[in-house]
């Protein structure tokens, strides 16, 4: 026993010997006696000390991203991963490992027949609400606001109801990664209304699916007002079989997707076989950046419908709309396009099979653009007026969708300069790295998307499926000219990539906080890393994925700076920022946001940007 004890003592002392924190190496462990030295965090400490030169300061920032799993939990989940059994324990795994996962919302047979008011609610499954409900109203106010990874499911809601009203006000505002499902909502309902107001405003990565919504409804009105206003980058909304077989149902989309960034809408079999439908799209996609809208079999085989597109995609930047089999085989349908597609920079509109096989239809195009394509459409009953041969902005560079301060010139990094700070706040869900012992056993390739979906309970066409697919494809994208890249799901993998590019004498830096975001700040003391010389570095940016995943890459010919950021009035230090300047932009695209903002072209100027919250930069140690 004495020999065993003598053997273990120096081994354990090595486990406790050094920990990284606050830029220094701490002896005597750095752990409290209660912390197990076999945890993933302790393992990361040892790996850093093994791989990084002993004179390089440690990084409490990187250590904070380490897995919170206990030693026992880490070993348990690693074993489950090797046996492909993690899906059976996913909720436990997500909770213990601090992952980003959607809850599994299963259907329920519980019924709710009375009026309901939901205020300040979150993450619910609504099944059989308002079924066969005469009159009354349900109100959702300030529901799922300021949430993270919000998912709500509405199934068989207001089905067969009469005169029942539903109000969604301030729903899922300012939330991050939102998925809402409306299935068989208002089906076969008579009268009443559904009102969506200030719905998903300011949301990051919104997804809403309306399936069989108001199907076979009679005189039921739906209003979408200020829907996904100022939302950012997501699949947007999908309307499938919306109002199909409906009778006299007015639908209004007002201020829908206004000032949003890269948001899509998909209308499939919308109003099909409907009678006397009245749909109005007013101020739809206005001031948006690259909106994508797809209308497929919209109003097909309908009777006496009226569709109005007013100020649709007005003042938007680029964007694309596709109308396929729109109003096909319909009867006496009236469609009016007014100020359609008056984008600042031209997008494209495709009308295929438009009004084909229809009788007695009247379709007016007033003020539409040069990039409109009309293919296989009806030759009668269609009127074209004021065809715009040039876009509103004449194709000029527009910087309204590039946030002020997001890119700047190197000359701005001088003490005393006033500079606009962009919003550097991290918009991603909070997650942790997985230990290498687990992440190495998980599938991660486009050929194994089905396996990844199984692990993380991602259904077909779900938000999680899109998140997984987008991340994997971006990671497998070939590097750009002179770029070296790798996606990493563990801190150990990040250390390996950084040291493979820069060597083992490296320093990891990040911007200290988000203080000064979206405000003017004053540049304080500036320090050029590596003497301010042109050098190489590794930058790592978060990707949206269930576990913490970073896209790390290195490009040649950069300068890296650290600078104090001061309050312009008091001159007090409020932040310490890290900036990287790309000295060679010749391989960048001409439509890159930097050139829109700074007014130049690839290869003619250098471009600088800040390292945002929770992103990081590795550089060779001075």
Swiss-Prot record:
Glycosylation sites recorded in the entry for this protein: 125, 278, 371, 388, 461
Role description: Involved in cell size determination.
Coiled-coil residues: none
Domain of life: Eukaryota
PANTHER family for the chain: POLYGALACTURONASE 1 BETA-LIKE PROTEIN 1-RELATED, POLYGALACTURONASE 1 BETA-LIKE PROTEIN 2
FXXY repeats: from-to residues: 118-121, 126-129, 140-143, 154-157, 168-171, 182-185, 196-199, 210-213, 224-227, 239-242, 253-256, 267-270, 281-284, 295-298, 309-312, 323-326, 337-340, 351-354, 365-368, 374-377, 384-387
Disruption phenotype: No visible phenotype. Atpgl1, atpgl2 and atpgl3 triple mutants produce smaller leaves and petioles.
Keyword annotations of the record: Apoplast, Cell wall, Glycoprotein, Repeat, Secreted, Signal
Signal peptide: 1-21
Protein name, per record: Polygalacturonase 1 beta-like protein 1
Name of the gene: PGL1
Record note on domains: The BURP domain located at the C-terminus has not been identified in non-plant proteins.
Residue ranges annotated for the BURP domain, each copy included: 407-621
Annotated compartments: Secreted, Extracellular space, Apoplast; Secreted, Cell wall
Organism: Arabidopsis thaliana (Mouse-ear cress)
Pfam families: BURP
Matching SMART domains: BURP
PROSITE patterns reported for this sequence: BURP
Tissue: Expressed in flowers and stems.
GO cellular component, one term: apoplast
